């Protein structure tokens, strides 16, 4: 039986390439040191074990470089899978899941009790110190009920559609996050909010991340998605957009479907004080590192010129 040959040592060229990469990253490390970056973790990357480990490594790397990461995660597909297992049908309006009392309890169970703990474990296994939270902890995310209206084609009357316990953040109380950051702990937040009446609300993870980014005065909001970023009408990636250009992309139909609410989240965050927001492909290994620490970045950056 032949023994496996040892892996070849890196060549001089490979070492030089790594040195150039580190040299390129240095000014970006200085730029972000001591600043907060909010990362929304979602999409198919959450279902890929290898990408999940790489994501956790990137979060720990950010922390080791002096950045204060805050993670907000989604979990729509996992909620859908649990509802299917329980034989509960899902209904959507404008991409939002109609959420009755039973469904919001299941959503909280999946988001806070399962997904959140898995992400915390991944970060801790990678050498970080993470703690799981939901928006209900210390009234972190106060939410109000979301409503939608649709015009009836027969009567031409606008009808209000009750989405149940779906909420939008109206206030973020970041005191708990500041305490965790001062203790060098990485917060991992499930997008569950609490209403003025104590009711639990399911919140879109992008929306929650944007509100948190504004509340903690983050330097960056990173939305990990399943697309490369904002595409022009020829399906080419737009690497950078001003606030005005991003709004035009919505108005003129360049942005369509699920990209519209993501751009709107970025606009609210930037208008709320975040320096820039980036929509990037979470399926790309180390997308966060590419965005933060390389000249070319990754995805589409939306900010004020």
From Swiss-Prot:
Organism: Rhodospirillum centenum (strain ATCC 51521 / SW)
UniProt cross-references to PANTHER family, sorted A to Z: N-ACETYLGLUTAMATE SYNTHASE (PTHR23342), N-ACETYLGLUTAMATE SYNTHASE, MITOCHONDRIAL (PTHR23342:SF0)
EC number: 2.7.2.8
One of the protein's GO biological processes: L-arginine biosynthetic process
Record's function text: Catalyzes the ATP-dependent phosphorylation of N-acetyl-L-glutamate.
An example molecular function term from Gene Ontology annotations: acetylglutamate kinase activity
Stated name of the protein: Acetylglutamate kinase
Family statement: Belongs to the acetylglutamate kinase family. ArgB subfamily.
Pathway field: Amino-acid biosynthesis; L-arginine biosynthesis; N(2)-acetyl-L-ornithine from L-glutamate: step 2/4
Domain of life: Bacteria
Cellular component aspect of the GO annotation: cytoplasm
NCBIfam families per the UniProt record, alphabetical: argB (TIGR00761)
């Amino acid at each position: 039986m032949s023994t496996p040959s040892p892996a070849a040592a890196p060549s001089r060229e490979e070492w030089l390439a790594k040195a150039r990469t580190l040299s390129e990253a240095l000014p970006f490390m200085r730029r972000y040191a001591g600043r907060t970056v909010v990362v929304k973790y979602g999409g198919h990357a959450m279902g890929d074990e290898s990408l999940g480990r790489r994501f956790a490594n990137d979060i720990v790397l950010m922390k080791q470089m002096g950045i204060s990461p805050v993670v907000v995660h989604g979990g729509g597909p996992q909620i859908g899978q649990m509802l299917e297992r329980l034989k509960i049908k899902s209904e959507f309006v404008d991409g939002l899941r109609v959420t009755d009392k039973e469904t919001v309890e299941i959503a909280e169970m999946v988001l806070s009790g399962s997904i959140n703990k898995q992400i915390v474990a991944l970060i801790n296994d990678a050498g970080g110190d993470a703690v799981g939270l939901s928006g209900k902890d210390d009234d972190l995310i106060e939410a109000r009920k979301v409503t939608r209206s649709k015009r009836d084609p027969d009567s031409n009357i606008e009808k209000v559609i009750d989405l149940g316990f779906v909420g939008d953040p109206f206030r973020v109380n970041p005191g708990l996050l500041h305490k965790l950051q001062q203790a060098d702990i990485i917060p991992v937040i499930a997008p569950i909010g609490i209403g003025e009446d104590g009711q639990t609300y399911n919140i879109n993870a992008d929306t929650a991340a944007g509100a948190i980014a504004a509340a903690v005065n983050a330097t960056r909001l990173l939305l990990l998605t399943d697309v490369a970023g904002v595409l022009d009408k020829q399906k080419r990636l737009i690497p950078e957009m001003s606030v005005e250009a991003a709004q035009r992309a919505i108005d003129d139909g360049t942005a369509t479907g699920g990209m519209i609410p993501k751009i709107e989240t970025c606009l609210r965050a930037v208008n709320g004080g975040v320096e820039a927001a980036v929509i990037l492909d979470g399926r790309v290994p180390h997308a966060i590192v590419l965005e933060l620490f390389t000249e070319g970045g990754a995805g589409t950056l939306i900010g004020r010129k």
